[in-house]
Amino acid sequence: MNGTANPLLDREEHCLRLGESFEKRPRASFHTIRYDFKPASIDTSCEGELQVGKGDEVTITLPHIPGSTPPMTVFKGNKRPYQKDCVLIINHDTGEYVLEKLSSSIQVKKTRAEGSSKIQARMEQQPTRPPQTSQPPPPPPPMPFRAPTKPPVGPKTSPLKDNPSPEPQLDDIKRELRAEVDIIEQMSSSSGSSSSDSESSSGSDDDSSSSGGEDNGPASPPQPSHQQPYNSRPAVANGTSRPQGSNQLMNTLRNDLQLSESGSDSDD
């Protein structure tokens, strides 16, 4: 002891127990292993493999972290027996101190030889971890193009509902035409009767004037009267021109009435 206290040991007294390696027929053996070089890529969470061959030749195979090259490291060496060396095992969970006797000391060196088939199969069964790279994340995929949505089309209305049926309008036109025809016929009949009355009255006036002139002697020359042309021309106008215009208008209205009736029949 160099005088420096081991942090794993305290200054209290503990009960020391001899392990199974001190029995007459030991059920366990303990060895020490020394490596000349141990790579940092060795996976300490996985189990390795130790093989003892002929002539105390020892081969140790330790796996590497997944994704490393090579996938494992192989160590080879030999062992030498120990005579008086022991190892102290301290269980910090139970506080128990156990002393075990060392059987041999193994010293190995790193080689380039491949490991055993068991380690190789175990490495192949383990899922490989993808290598971590510092590549930037891929850009997001482009958004798909969407056509602009059309506004909803309102319910279509039938033209028959929007435009009312023309039959009521035709009926109204027929009534108006018939009323006009009746009015014109009444006007023409009244104008004919008035013209005949005026002609008969004018004839009786002429007869009375002629008979009065014969009785009273020679009559003075007739003075021009403004009523005679006024009375005669309206008679002519009422007797001839007025009925002709009314007849033409009646014919036109009748034709229109027939056309409207024929049109309504064709629509039906």
Curated annotation (Swiss-Prot):
Keywords: Activator, Nucleus, Phosphoprotein, Transcription, Transcription regulation
GO-annotated biological processes: regulation of transcription elongation by RNA polymerase II; transcription elongation by RNA polymerase II
Annotated positions of the Phosphoserine modification: S165
First-listed, main subcellular location of the protein, grouped into a coarse class: nucleus
Tissue: Strongly expressed in heart, brain, placenta, lung, liver, skeletal muscle, kidney, pancreas, spleen, prostate, testis, small intestine and colon. Poorly expressed in thymus.
Residue ranges, compositional bias (Low complexity): 188-213
Residue segments, region Disordered: 106-268
Annotated stretches, region: Necessary for transactivation activity: 182-262
Keyword Transcription regulation: yes
Single GO molecular function: transcription elongation factor activity
Pro residues bias (residue ranges): 128-154
GO cellular component: Cajal body; intercellular bridge; intracellular membrane-bounded organelle; nuclear body; nuclear speck; nucleoplasm; super elongation complex; transcription elongation factor complex
InterPro entries registered for this protein in UniProt: EAF_fam, Tscrpt_elong_fac_Eaf_N
Comp. bias regions, Basic and acidic residues: 171-181
Compartment(s) where it occurs, according to its Swiss-Prot or TrEMBL record: Nucleus speckle; Nucleus, Cajal body
One Pfam family named in its UniProt record: EAF
Polar residues bias: start-end ranges: 238-268
Top-level taxon in the UniProt lineage: Eukaryota
Subunit structure, as described in the record: Component of the super elongation complex (SEC), at least composed of EAF1, EAF2, CDK9, MLLT3/AF9, AFF (AFF1 or AFF4), the P-TEFb complex and ELL (ELL, ELL2 or ELL3). Interacts with ELL and ELL2.
Biological role stated in the UniProt entry: Acts as a transcriptional transactivator of ELL and ELL2 elongation activities.
Family that this chain belongs to: Belongs to the EAF family.
Protein's name in the database: ELL-associated factor 1
